[in-house]
Amino acid sequence: MSSSSTALKTFSLTNSILEISPQDAIYKFDPDEARRIDQESPWSKDPHFFKSCKISAVALIKMVIHARSGVPHEIMGLMQGKVVGNSIVIMDSFALPVQGTETRVNAANEANEYMVEYTEGSSKAQRPEHAIGWYHSHPGYGCWLSGIDVNTQMNNQKYQDPFVAVVIDPNRTISAGKVDIGAFRTYPENYKPPSTSSSEYQSIPLSKIEDFGVHANQYYQIDVEIFKSTLDNELLGLLWNKYWVNTLSQSPLISNRAYAVSQLSDLHQKLSKVQTSVTTTRAAIPVLQDKEGSASKKEKEEKKKEENQLAKGVKDSTKIAVEAQHGLIAQVIKDVIFSMRPKGDASTAQLSDVTDTAMSIG
């Protein structure tokens, strides 16, 4: 039990889960306030009205478990919650019986019937929160919205706003040890978003880059915050006790082996593509600035573009190496803690050296 508790605390710290009082207003549902907000619909006047998406820890774990169970296929579910200020608050989530592939997920009539029955049952069980978002997984290729996702979210916002789209990458979650999650809202049709600086770099597989870039200006990302109350700890403990043994007994190096291979293959393709466009490293012949100014400027721009692509390749390779080192560190630590060893300081000192070396590299 103590090991399970430690693992749960580590999960909470890694994902920056905030603990709030169970008497906090976030846990209270006011139907009059909900109707007032729906009537005013401030989000219809300001496309950037929502600034954050707050997700309960229970809903988060349910979504992550669901996403992981579907690998390598995508999964889909709905989220229930409410609007508080400029935030969409997710109180609970439930899976949908849908058929997914490695690149998309399709909701059939059975899923729609299940959705209606579940929401009606929630009302009878004194859970009045409405469906306020949907979630699905991107196994191994990051958190963003594809063209199909953008169309789905646009329809949701058009007919049942407020609505939010959440994407989870279960492969990167296992590999990095932190939930890889993103929350998104789409812009209205014919809306031109203001030019913004590029967000934090995200590694996208070469096969998905075109789809990622084409629709990048049709939606925006909002901050994700995770919260829980002291009353949630017991429920989280029950959920965690069921899965923490698998966490200890499995290694991300083995369970995520296919994902690691796909990452290396993708990195090879990216570097090969960059290599074909890299100019010669031989020093350029000096030319007069007034005659060759425009040509020199063009060469600098091309060189900057090449360096940018190479820098992305370096970031991808560093990410792969760090995640592999973290997996090795975890295996060494579990070996030190749980393996039976003869008395003596030699083996312990040797393992300590291995751990220190791995940590210094990672």
Residue ranges, per PLM feature:
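MPN/JAMM (Mov34/JAB) isopeptidase/deubiquitinase module and associated MPN-bearing subunits/adaptors
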Residues: 1-133, 139-362
